[in-house]
């Protein structure tokens, strides 16, 4: 029988865990998929494996071994993403999980002490009692009576628990009869107490219904407004979105304007918390593109305004004595972008938006932080999710930058949808009917697995027709812009600020490429105006000319071979 792996001898005694931080052995065999290195901070414990990792999200180590008839081979060691059952053990006691292949079995353990995953106490012989066989785990001789007694005890415990619940319910009912009706839960009552009534608010019709809220069209003091009504069970979602809209400095032409928060309800419906927002009668970008085509100037106006709105959200700034943090939208889709009266875009629905870590926030600034990797990687519409969100490989060490990159990927899909309805980019002037991104490849309701296979495994993107080069300042300008935004490598993507600069360059081209089909270009008066210069960015933020998210960032040039002046992040 194999002994311990003896990995303790390879760990330097100088590696000590700080208080409240678990330190584990880290190892991943070649070919293992799904790295866990982002769940902790890797430390240099020696010239070769195993290494040491300091856990960020749990106080639990794990180990996985592959037992064959000849030997036990380490497959993975590291930190778990949460404290699971079994993590209270101070030693690694592996248990069989599955048959990796014929003649081998995977064993895993969880433990809650520093370096506890370096050694295992014992492994049963392959094919012995407790090792999974073709029909699953086999019970050892003599286990059946003990198992029956354990089940009997569990049944008795459940019966006692049910009896206690029944008695408690009867006592509560008797108390209600004596003391009158019970008040509503605290969460709903507190929310109602702090929200004003809006007696002049009128509801007209439902625009959209979702999982956490319904959006109505209505009026407030004679102004047409959109009213987002939350049920009482969604008070937490209401508070999170309200807190974002009420951030100082969050006013921009291309972000939906927040008007008020209050309580109420349409007609006889029960009142609940609500947000009053600016109404855009032309509807969402998806609805608009389904019913209209847009010439070159109008398409650029939509694309540029969308990039300006996202760049504003991502930007961290001080202006007029007010601090605005960077914000990741995390649910950028053509349903959540609205069309203004002038044909430009306004980004809405901040229900999943997240305040990002900053470089120069005030000392008293303490925004709520996401709790663990799952909260950081939460995203909205699957169709627009970046590859690193689909395969759960988002960079958790610098999650603020990583979420900005994921937004830029979604932005690229929206730009493709806008340009796909531009007749000036078609030889015959007839764009096809509107389709969402990946709808041609996967249909109207793709599954997560289908999106993963297409966007992650095959690295495919929506088709870019060759005729789109006609209106770029250099051949392939539009193609290069989209490809630089939806690159499979997040670090290679443009920033939203750089997307804005490239679109400005397309609005005012120096030389227009002749279109082979002879279609005329749009007139200059149809082009959208250049954006006003943005206020100075904070020290340490990406500079206005910085294109990519990498450490070395170059100026915004459409020539990939041109020399780029680097700037510090």
Curated annotation (Swiss-Prot):
One of its GO terms (biological process) is BMP signaling pathway. The active site is at residue 331. One of its GO terms (cellular component) is plasma membrane. Residues 18-148 are extracellular. Keywords: ATP-binding, Disulfide bond, Glycoprotein, Kinase, Magnesium, Manganese, Membrane, Metal-binding, Nucleotide-binding, Receptor, Serine/threonine-protein kinase, Signal, Transferase, Transmembrane, Transmembrane helix. Interacts with type I receptor ACVR1. InterPro entries: Anti-muellerian_hrmn_rcpt_II (IPR015771), Kinase-like_dom_sf (IPR011009), Prot_kinase_dom (IPR000719), Snake_toxin-like_sf (IPR045860), TGFB_receptor (IPR000333). GO terms for molecular function: ATP binding; metal ion binding; transforming growth factor beta receptor activity. Belongs to the protein kinase superfamily. TKL Ser/Thr protein kinase family. TGFB receptor subfamily. The chain crosses the membrane at residues 149-169. Residues 201-511 form the Protein kinase domain. Residues 1-17 form the signal peptide. It is a single-pass type I membrane protein. Residues 512-535 are annotated as: Disordered. Disulfide bonds join 55-79, 92-109. Its EC number is 2.7.11.30. It is found in: Membrane. Its cofactor is Mg(2+); Mn(2+). This is Anti-Muellerian hormone type-2 receptor. The gene is AMHR2. ATP binds at residues 207-215, 228. Glycans are attached at residues 66, 119. PANTHER family: ANTI-MUELLERIAN HORMONE TYPE-2 RECEPTOR, TRANSFORMING GROWTH FACTOR-BETA RECEPTOR TYPE I AND II. Residues 170-569 are cytoplasmic. On ligand binding, forms a receptor complex consisting of two type II and two type I transmembrane serine/threonine kinases. Type II receptors phosphorylate and activate type I receptors which autophosphorylate, then bind and activate SMAD transcriptional regulators. Receptor for anti-Muellerian hormone.
């Amino acid at each position: 029988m194999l002994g311990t792996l003896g990995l303790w001898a390879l760990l330097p005694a100088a590696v000590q865990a700080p208080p409240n931080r678990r330190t584990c052995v880290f190892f991943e065999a070649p070919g293992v998929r799904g790295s866990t290195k982002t769940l902790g901070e890797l430390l240099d414990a020696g010239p070769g494996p195993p290494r040491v990792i300091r856990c960020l999200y749990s106080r639990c180590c794990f180990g996985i071994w592959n037992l064959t008839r000849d030997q036990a081979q380490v497959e993975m060691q590291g930190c778990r993403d949460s404290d699971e059952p079994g993590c209270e053990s101070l030693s690694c006691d592996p248990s069989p999980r599955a048959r990796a292949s014929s003649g081998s079995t995977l064993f895993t353990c969880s433990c809650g002490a520093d370096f506890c995953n370096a050694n295992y106490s014992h492994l049963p012989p392959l094919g012995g009692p407790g090792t999974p066989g073709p029909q699953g785990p086999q019970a050892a001789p003599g286990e059946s009576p003990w198992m029956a007694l354990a089940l009997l005890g569990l049944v008795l415990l459940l019966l006692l628990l049910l009896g206690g619940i029944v008695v408690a319910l009867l006592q509560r009912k008797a108390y209600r009869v004596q003391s009158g009706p019970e008040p509503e839960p605290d969460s709903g009552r507190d929310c109602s107490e702090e929200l004003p009534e809006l007696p002049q608010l009128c509801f007209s019709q439902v625009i959209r219904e979702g999982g956490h809220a319904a959006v109505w069209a209505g009026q407030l003091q004679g102004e047409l407004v959109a009213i987002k009504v939350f049920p009482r069970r969604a008070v937490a979602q209401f508070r999170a979105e309200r807190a974002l809209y009420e951030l100082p400095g969050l006013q921009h032409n291309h972000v939906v304007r927040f008007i008020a928060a209050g309580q109420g309800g349409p007609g006889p419906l029960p009142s609940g918390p609500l947000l009053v927002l600016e109404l855009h009668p032309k509807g969402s970008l998806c609805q608009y593109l389904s019913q209209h085509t847009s010439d070159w100037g109008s398409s650029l106006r939509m694309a540029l305004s969308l990039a300006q709105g996202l760049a504003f959200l991502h930007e961290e700034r001080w202006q007029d004595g007010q601090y605005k943090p960077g914000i990741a939208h995390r649910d950028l889709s053509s349903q959540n972008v609205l069309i203004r009266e002038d044909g430009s875009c306004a980004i809405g629905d901040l229900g999943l938006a997240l305040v990002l870590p900053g470089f120069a926030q005030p000392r008293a600034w303490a925004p709520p932080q996401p709790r663990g990797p799952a909260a950081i990687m939460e995203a909205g519409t699957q169709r627009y999710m970046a590859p690193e969100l689909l395969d759960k490989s988002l960079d958790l060490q610098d999650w603020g930058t990583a979420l900005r990159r994921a937004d830029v990927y979604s932005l690229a899909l929206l730009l493709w949808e806008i340009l796909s309805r531009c007749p000036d980019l078609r030889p015959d002037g007839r764009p096809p009917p509107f389709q969402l991104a990946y709808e041609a490849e996967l249909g109207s309701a793709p599954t997560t697995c289908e999106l993963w296979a297409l966007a992650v495994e095959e690295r495919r993107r929506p088709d870019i027709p060759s005729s789109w080069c006609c209106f770029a300042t250099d051949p392939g300008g539009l193609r290069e812009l989209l490809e630089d935004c939806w690159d499979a490598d997040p670090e290679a993507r443009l920033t939203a600020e750089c997307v804005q600069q490239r679109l400005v360059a397309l609005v005012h081209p120096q030389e227009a490429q002749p279109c082979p089909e002879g279609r005329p270009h749009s007139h200059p008066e149809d082009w959208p105006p250049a954006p006003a210069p943005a206020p100075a960015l904070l020290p340490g933020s990406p500079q206005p000319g910085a294109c990519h998210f990498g450490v070395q960032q170059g100026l915004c040039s459409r020539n990939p071979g041109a020399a780029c002046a680097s700037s510090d992040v």
